[in-house]
């Protein structure tokens, strides 16, 4: 049971542990900034300081109204992970991830920001992804300030579509520059991102894959981290290796891997992927 306490512009969340590193530094989100004074995140046009204290998460500055309308759904505080982790304990492999991944949760991120961020993520590393995103935000976002922190909002489809491919290349986007430009223009011109909430997983994936720069893996990331379609199972070389080494399953295609995961983990396939992925990244290998 999540417990929320308000103290001016500071909010304390307890009752179910939320670990800053496990949530914001696990590959689902790219605007997390460790800081000597206090770590902070930027989502859409908002900056939030985040701090773990004992078994709680403290966040600030936020009004109660902003928290309830934006940060509460962003952090998916309506969802408990206790039952999910109980299910994972029944799996011989997943049960090893639960203690390490305690405090993780899937975020509900802005649809357009997630779309562009994961187009940038293709064949890329996290350090470079973050650098490209910040460059694009500086080029097309709005300059803002919270306390002493200056930052840029994530561009809207309208402002991002105003950047030329040459300008996107200057931001470090590389071969992804035309994908970003064309997709931003498509959304600006009416490509519907909201209808995805009402689609089945398969239909939503096909819909996203009509956009330039969106293949099956990128689509699954968007569906999982923005639309909370938890059956989405992003597949890369790490995930294929996990399935082969620990589940004795060697998929010939990404689609085979997704179907295996849905059969194995059901509606929690995407959450299972994040637990496995985070565990391998932090522990190097699962102890058999």
Model-identified regions with their sequence ranges:
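HhH-family (HhH-GPD) DNA N-glycosylase catalytic core used in base-excision repair
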Residues: 1-288
